[in-house]
Amino acid sequence: MLTFIGLGLYDKTDVSEKGLAMIRSADYVFLEGYTSRLMGTNITELEAFYKKPVRLLLRADVEQHPDELLDCAARGNTVFLCAGDPMVSTTHADLRIRAAERGIPTAIIHGSSIVSAVCGLSGLQNYRFGKSCSVPFPQGNWAPSSPLDVILENRTNRLHTLVYLDIQDDRYMTVNEGICLLEAMAQKKQVAIPFYVGVARAGSETSLVRAGTAETLRSADFGPPLHILIVPGELHDMEREYLARFAGLC
């Protein structure tokens, strides 16, 4: 049996009671830490909380070499843990398909997700979001323009864009860095992004939301990670008022 369990947004206490009970009864516990991370805890603290050893998985362990995980699931009760909500990442969906191909039963226990959390924090309505995109750290002279293409297409359709910011080992892209990279893309295409919404540490007691122009937010202090960006489309009056009251939009 392979059960996918979402751990929520920030620390060990975000997991549901159902999820925690399943973890504590599992024979094998795996945690992937490459799509997102719980910044309010660490693996030592999680092991003490779960009363179980936890095997940390790298991207290659899931995408290229999942046999050890699937072998465990074939012979015992196995849980696959991730920050946020399972199946938001396509790699989780692929793993579930691979398990099914081997005849391994699967289940999902959901957790709170950044996808819904940003709507509550920013006041932007969830049905007015289009396709999301990711901004990676540049590699040498390589810097993709595809994130801007997604943003422009969404704005053409009056939709908001959720922009995931890159994570590499212990390096976390900030709102400031993400804006600088998007502004460089926009300058090359000679287009303008009117304003951004930056969100930091969603799910924590120190969560922060700020809205403003690139010039304003590039120098703003968003504090520790994780960060995420929103590029709004056309705003409803209530969305604008919410951003003004809770995110400093002028």
Curated annotation (Swiss-Prot):
Which reaction is catalysed here? Answer: 2-[(3S)-amino-3-carboxypropyl]-L-histidyl-[translation elongation factor 2] + 3 S-adenosyl-L-methionine = diphthine-[translation elongation factor 2] + 3 S-adenosyl-L-homocysteine + 3 H(+)
InterPro entries from the UniProt entry: 4pyrrol_Mease, 4pyrrol_Methylase_sf, 4pyrrole_Mease_sub1, 4pyrrole_Mease_sub2, Dphthn_synthase
* Residue sites binding S-adenosyl-L-methionine per the record: 9, 85, 88, 113-114, 165, 202, 227
Mind listing the GO molecular function terms for this protein?
diphthine synthase activity
One GO term of the biological process aspect: methylation
Could you tell me the EC number(s) of this protein? 2.1.1.98
Q: Which UniProt keywords apply?
A: Methyltransferase, S-adenosyl-L-methionine, Transferase
Pathway involvement? Protein modification; peptidyl-diphthamide biosynthesis
Q: How does it assemble?
A: Homodimer.
UniProt lists the family membership as follows: Belongs to the diphthine synthase family.
The record ties this protein, via PANTHER family, to: DIPHTHINE METHYL ESTER SYNTHASE, DIPHTHINE SYNTHASE
Q: What does this protein do?
A: S-adenosyl-L-methionine-dependent methyltransferase that catalyzes the trimethylation of the amino group of the modified target histidine residue in translation elongation factor 2 (EF-2), to form an intermediate called diphthine. The three successive methylation reactions represent the second step of diphthamide biosynthesis.
Q: What is this protein called?
A: Diphthine synthase
Q: Which organism is it from?
A: Methanoregula boonei (strain DSM 21154 / JCM 14090 / 6A8)
